[in-house]
Amino acid sequence: MEGVQEILSRAGIFQGVDPTAVNNLIQDMETVRFPRGATIFDEGEPGDRLYIITSGKVKLARHAPDGRENLLTIMGPSDMFGELSIFDPGPRTSSAVCVTEVHAATMNSDMLRNWVADHPAIAEQLLRVLARRLRRTNASLADLIFTDVPGRVAKTLLQLANRFGTQEAGALRVNHDLTQEEIAQLVGASRETVNKALATFAHRGWIRLEGKSVLIVDTEHLARRAR
């Protein structure tokens, strides 16, 4: 089983940076624990901390004035969030809520700026992290316009599998820990429509639905449907 230091060292912010410097910074970071369902920060509030998950899952979401929630992404071990507030003094652009119990390492803006000053390579890594997120956002917008709901459901399942999947007897187990409503928010469609697509995939033998997990039996057909 991986240790906390190994998980943190895989974070995008640390890629390509001197390992000794990374280990020194990791030792200086504060460790925090949040129970399942806890809100780490709310959309609109000020913030000056970034977080790197060491265990558990966090959902980032935005809320409409009428209370509706739009789920942006699900993050897991080695993923970083909250960094925008360090470089942009504006309010938080999303809420971060724990899907499961979460352990994380955190640093404030002063600590990060001092580290960037001592290790300029970190600035390039941060730009790469932000660029990858922008690419994913653009791809998600294109999917909402050009891809039907079953296609988006298939793509979402494959993305969750890529992030959280484990091999199990020739299939791929995805323990997503999400409710049906949260899956629908992640897809960007109604729960009824998403459930219909999932039921169709299950009927065709591509997947098996098992509580808050999905067993992907036929990755090839699911990938074709996602195109």
Swiss-Prot record:
GO biological process assignments: regulation of DNA-templated transcription; regulation of glyoxylate cycle
tRNA processing listed as a keyword: no
Gene3D superfamilies referenced in this protein's UniProt entry, alphabetically: Jelly Rolls, Winged helix-like DNA-binding domain superfamily/Winged helix DNA-binding domain
PROSITE patterns recorded: CNMP_BINDING_3, HTH_CRP_2
One Gene Ontology cellular component annotation held by this UniProt entry: cytosol
Description of what induces expression: Seems to repress its own expression.
UniProt keyword terms in alphabetical order: Activator, cAMP, cAMP-binding, DNA-binding, Kinase, Nucleotide-binding, Repressor, Transcription, Transcription regulation, Transferase
Pfam families, per database record: cNMP_binding, HTH_Crp_2
Chain positions recorded as 3',5'-cyclic AMP 2 binding sites: 145-146, 181-191
The HTH crp-type domain, residue ranges: 147-220
Subunit structure: Homodimer.
Summary of the function given for this chain in its UniProt record: Global transcriptional regulator that complexes with cAMP and binds to specific DNA promoter sites, causing DNA-bending, to regulate transcription. cAMP improves binding to specific DNA sequences, probably by altering protein conformation. Involved in the regulation of gntP and gntK genes, which are involved in gluconate metabolism. May form dimers which bind to the aceB promoter region in the presence of cAMP and repress the glyoxylate bypass genes.
Name by which UniProt lists this protein: CRP-like cAMP-activated global transcriptional regulator
Organism: Corynebacterium glutamicum (strain ATCC 13032 / DSM 20300 / JCM 1318 / BCRC 11384 / CCUG 27702 / LMG 3730 / NBRC 12168 / NCIMB 10025 / NRRL B-2784 / 534)
Name of the gene this protein is made from: glxR
